[in-house]
C-alpha cells in the first residue's frame, strides 16, 4: 500500500501543499491540500462526486493576500471532505497557484 501511494505521488504533475485556507461563502469549508490543478476541502458536509463548485479564496504570496477564483468538480467524496479538480480558472490565478506551491514546497 505504501509503495502504491509513493508511485501515485511521483506521477503527480504538482506536489500537494498542505495548508489551511478558508473558502469564502462556505463557513465550514477549509482547503487542506492545494496545487494548481485542484484541492482537498475539509467539510462535515461533502458534496457528491461530479457536483460542480465555485470557489473563492485567498493565498498569501509576496507579502500580500491574492484572490483565487475557480470553478471545479468534485472528483472524490469522503466523510471528512472532498477532492476538487479545477475546471475553469483565469491564467493569472493559475500562475499565482504555481508560484504559491513553488514557494512553500
Residue ranges and their predicted role:
Residues 1-36, 44, 102-105:
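N-terminal helix initiation/capping motif
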Residues 50-52:
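Loop/turn positions that initiate beta-strands
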Residues 59-63:
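Short, charged beta-turn/beta-strand-edge "cap" motif at the junction between a beta-strand
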Residues 36, 77-82:
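Short, conserved beta-turn/loop elements at beta-strand boundaries and strand-helix junctions
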Residues 24-26, 64-70:
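Short coil-to-beta-strand transition motifs
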Residues 31, 72-74:
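Conserved hydrophobic positions within beta-strands
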Residues 2-4, 13, 81-105:
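C-terminal output/interaction extensions
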